[in-house]
């Protein structure tokens, strides 16, 4: 049985509480001989700053480089608002993404049948929803230069941000999207603003070329990003895989997130390039929700997104798709029984704590392996 090396970075706030439920599941999988995980813990974010005055140490980064996957909790909180900019908690997350070369962000938006009434949209619009948004993570306007604010000397200022994409950056993210679609419902929707942005013209051109060269078996459509945002709300089940740039991906993935009813339900993955020698890629998995310091330590946090992020690691980094399917089924079964953390409570449901939710999901996993 293969040994999988995992680096666990709980971070701040509720990160430690939801990560505890992943550890509980890992311990059980190891004890049952279902899988073999070697885990190491590390500090990141505010916890790392308190200990070492940096958001992540070089030693922890070395562990991340050596791992098969990084499992990340959440960082940040008002406690660290006054720390130097380069040491702010979020800098640890950004360094992980940069140094591991994580260019592809995968954000699934899945609406469990038991939670369809928690969405702000009608049940018939969102029930059965299963979208994967593939966001380019290391290019675009967030990283382009120049990025300045200039005093014009006449009482006015000018701000400049620069949207930059090279062909290879678009090519590789497109391939991630097409490969995912082949394992799903075989459809990719590419979103950009080619009508007003040159980067959108190039994006459309490269995605179209990659499709024609290597993925003719996958259905490809193009939508302008603003129209795509409208369609995400109007008719979301038309989408399978959406691929888009950094800025639009940031916006569209948050829109898709709220179709499902709660940020506490949503996992994500960030992937690097496939190593030509090993066939593996650097990766990090994290819930979409933040550190939520206002509820930290109260047992109110929803661990589903953290557990589902571990499920994505099983599927995309550890070649354990069957086990990931069972974890997804366990989560769905718990929700179908009406068990809820406070963020997803509804009339007639039973509200339980973070640890009780983790325990309930583990019991369903045990039943599936009986």
UniProtKB/Swiss-Prot annotation:
What sort of enzyme, by top EC class, is this? oxidoreductase
Cell compartment(s), UniProt: Cytoplasm
Q: What is its EC number?
A: 1.1.1.85
Main location group: cytoplasm
- What keywords are assigned to this protein? Amino-acid biosynthesis, Branched-chain amino acid biosynthesis, Cytoplasm, Leucine biosynthesis, Magnesium, Manganese, Metal-binding, NAD, Oxidoreductase
**Pathway membership, UniProt:** Amino-acid biosynthesis; L-leucine biosynthesis; L-leucine from 3-methyl-2-oxobutanoate: step 3/4
According to its UniProt entry, one GO biological process term is: L-leucine biosynthetic process
Fetch the InterPro entries from UniProt. IsoCit/isopropylmalate_DH_CS, IsoPropMal-DH-like_dom, Isopropylmalate_DH
Cofactor(s) it depends on? Mg(2+); Mn(2+)
UniProt entry tagged with the keyword NAD:
yes
Q: Where does NAD(+) bind?
A: 77-90, 290-302
Which GO MF terms does the UniProt record name?
3-isopropylmalate dehydrogenase activity; magnesium ion binding; NAD binding
Q: Where is this site: Important for catalysis?
A: 142, 193
Where on this chain does Mg(2+) bind?
A: 226, 250, 254
Alphabetized SMART domains for the sequence: Iso_dh
SUPFAM superfamilies referenced in this protein's UniProt entry, alphabetically: Isocitrate/Isopropylmalate dehydrogenase-like
Q: What does this protein do?
A: Catalyzes the oxidation of 3-carboxy-2-hydroxy-4-methylpentanoate (3-isopropylmalate) to 3-carboxy-4-methyl-2-oxopentanoate. The product decarboxylates to 4-methyl-2 oxopentanoate.
Q: Which family does it belong to?
A: Belongs to the isocitrate and isopropylmalate dehydrogenases family. LeuB type 1 subfamily.
Q: Note the subunit structure.
A: Homodimer.
Identify this protein by name.
Answer: 3-isopropylmalate dehydrogenase
The record lists the organism as Rhodopseudomonas palustris (strain BisB18)
From the UniProt record, report the name of the gene that encodes this protein: leuB
């Amino acid at each position: 049985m293969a040994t999988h090396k995992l680096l666990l970075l709980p971070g701040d706030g509720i990160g430690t509480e939801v990560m505890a439920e992943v550890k509980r599941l890992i311990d059980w999988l190891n004890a049952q001989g279902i899988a073999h995980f070697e885990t190491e813990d590390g500090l990141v974010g505010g916890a790392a700053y308190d200990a070492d005055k940096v958001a992540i140490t070089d030693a922890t980064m070395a562990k991340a480089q050596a791992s098969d996957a990084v499992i990340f909790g959440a960082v940040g909180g008002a406690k660290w608002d006054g720390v130097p900019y380069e040491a702010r908690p979020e800098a640890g997350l950004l360094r992980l993404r940069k140094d591991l070369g994580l260019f592809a962000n995968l954000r699934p938006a899945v609406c469990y049948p038991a939670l369809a009434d928690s969405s702000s949209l009608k049940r018939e619009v969102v029930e059965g929803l299963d979208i994967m948004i593939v966001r380019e993570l290391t290019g675009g306007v967030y990283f382009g230069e120049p990025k300045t604010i200039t005093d014009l000397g006449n009482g006015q200022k000018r701000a400049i941000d620069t949207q930059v994409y090279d062909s290879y950056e678009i090519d590789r993210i497109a391939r991630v999207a097409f490969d995912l679609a082949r394992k799903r419902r075989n459809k990719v929707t590419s979103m950009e603003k080619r009508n007003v942005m040159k980067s959108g013209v190039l994006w459309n051109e490269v995605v179209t070329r990659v499709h024609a060269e290597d993925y003719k078996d996958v259905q490809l459509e193009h939508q302008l990003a603003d129209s795509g945002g409208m369609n995400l709300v109007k008719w979301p089940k038309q989408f399978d895989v959406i691929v888009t740039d950094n800025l639009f991906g940031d916006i569209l993935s948050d829109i898709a997130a709220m179709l499902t009813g709660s940020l506490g339900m949503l996992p994500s993955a960030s992937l690097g390039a496939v190593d030509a020698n090993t066939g593996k890629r650097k990766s990090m998995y994290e819930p979409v929700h933040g550190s939520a310091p206002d509820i930290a330590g109260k047992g109110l946090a929803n661990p589903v997104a953290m557990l589902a992020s571990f499920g994505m690691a099983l599927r995309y980094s550890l070649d354990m798709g069957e086990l990931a399917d069972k974890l997804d089924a366990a989560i769905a079964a718990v929700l179908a029984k009406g068990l809820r953390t406070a963020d997803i409570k509804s009339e007639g449901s039973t509200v339980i704590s973070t640890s009780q939710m983790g325990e309930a999901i583990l019991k369903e996993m045990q039943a599936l392996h009986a």
